[in-house]
Amino acid sequence: MAIKDLDLKLQPDSVSISNINFDQLNSHVVIAEDGVMNVASLVKSDEAEVAEPEVQESQKAETKPFPISIDTVSINDGAVTFIDNTMSPRFTTKLSHFKGAIKGLSSAELARADVDLNGRVDDVAQLSVTGKINPLKGDLYSDIKIRFEGYDMTAVTPYTGNFIGQAVDKGQLDLDLGYRVSERELIGENEISLDQFTLGRDIKSEDAVDLPVGLAIALLKDANGRIDLSLPVRGNLDEPEFKISKIVFKALFNVITGIVTSPFKLLSNLAGGDQELDKVAFVPGELNMVSGHQTRLESLAKALTQRPQLRIEVRGMFDQDRDVQALQQQKLATFFELSEQVTFADLKLSSIEAKLNKQLGKEALTSIKAENMVLPEGANEKAKPELDVEAYRFALYESLLKAQPVTDDELRELARSRASQIRNYLVETEGLSPERVFIMEAEADDSANEAGVLTVFQLSVD
C-alpha cells in the first residue's frame, strides 16, 4: 500500500490525501462453521481492546466530525478469496485481477465518491462495480450498480444442495444489481439471468425447502433455455436482523412460491392476457365448449410453446346433474325423432301416450292421467273431473325424460371425449408435441360452475 500527499492539520482538524494505492492486495474472507466471518471477528477484537475514556456530556456535544478527503483510492491487480465453511462441501470462490479506482471520497455534507472497479471471478466471470458512495459520513449513502457476467453455476452446488437438495449440473449466471441506500433505507433491484440452468443429482439436506423447484424452473425457462428474473428488495439498515442475503433469499423464495402455487397465472401473462387457463367449460351433454373458451386453448398453446419443458395434463369431467339431464333430453329427442322442425309440442298426444305405454307400461300411463284430472273452473265438487291437457302433456314429458337411462360409463365416455377433443386441438391445430399432452382419468365435476361442465388442466415437468 502506498499513500501519496498526506496532509494532516489540527485546529481546525482535517486530513487530506491525494492517493492511496493498493498494489497486488491479497485478502481472505472466511466464514467459519459457526457463521462468524473472520473480518467481523477482527472488528470485535479491536473494539474490545480499545477502552473509551469517560467524556462529559458537554464535551460530547462539542465534538465535531473529523474532516477527511481522499482524492483517489486505486487498486491494481488485487485478489480476494472467499470461503464459506457453513456449507458442506465448503464453498470457495476467488476474485482476481481486481482493479479500478474510487475518486472523491470526502466526509463533507452531500459528498459523493465515484466508484469504477472491475475484476474476474474464478478467472472466468467478469465483474464490474460502478456508482457513487459516501462511506465517510454518518448518514450512509450509496448508489451502486454491480454487473456480473458468465459465472459458472456448478460452483454454487454447495448452496443449491443445502437449500433445494440438488446439485447444479450446468448453467451460467448473469447479474445486474442496483442498490441504493439513503437515510438508512435500502432499495435494491436484482436482475437475474440464467442460461441453460439445469439441476443434477440429489443431495440430502435437512434445510432444503419443500417446493417443486423443477416445476418452477420449467415455468421460468424459455424456449432458448434462459431464465430471467426480477427481484426488487427493500429494507432498513437499522433493523436488528437486517441481512441483505436474507432479504434476497426471502424475495426469491416468495417469487418461486408464487409461481408454483399459481402456474397458470404466469402462463396467462406469457400469452398476453388474464384468462383462466387452468380450465375450460363445456355445454352440458355436449362436446362443444361454451362461448369464448376456445380462445383459452389458443392462449394456453401459445404459452406452452414458450415453455418447452412443461407438459399439460387434461382431465375431462362430467356433471352428474347437468350432463345427465342433457343426455336424457338428447335420448328423448332421438326416441321421438325430434328436430328443429318437429318439437315435443308438435307431437300428437296419442303418440306420446303410446311411447310412454311402451316404455313404462299401462299402469304408469293410467296413474299419470289420474294425477292430472281436475275439476272445471267454477264447477262444484260433484262435477265430473276433466283432463288438464297441458299439465298432462308436461307430466308425460317429465316421466319419459326421467326414464331415459344414462349410465356412469356414458358419463365417463363423454368426459374422455372432451379431453380427447382438447388434446387433438392442441396437437393437430396448435402444433404441440403429442408427448407433451396427456389425458387423465375422467372425474365428476362437483364445482357447479356457472359457465358449464369443466375440463381442468394440470402441469408437470418433462
Regions found by a protein language model. Name each.
Residues 1, 7-8, 53-54, 60-61, ...:
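A short linear-motif detector with a strong N-terminal bias
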Residues 1-97, 196-214, 237-254:
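Secondary-structure transition motifs
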Residues 8-13, 18, 66-68, 134-147, ...:
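Extended terminal
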Residues 2-9, 14-16, 36-43, 81-161, ...:
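Beta-strand-dominated lipid-handling architectures at cellular/organellar boundaries
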Residues 73, 115-117, 312:
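Hydrophobic beta-strand residues in large extracellular and virion-surface proteins
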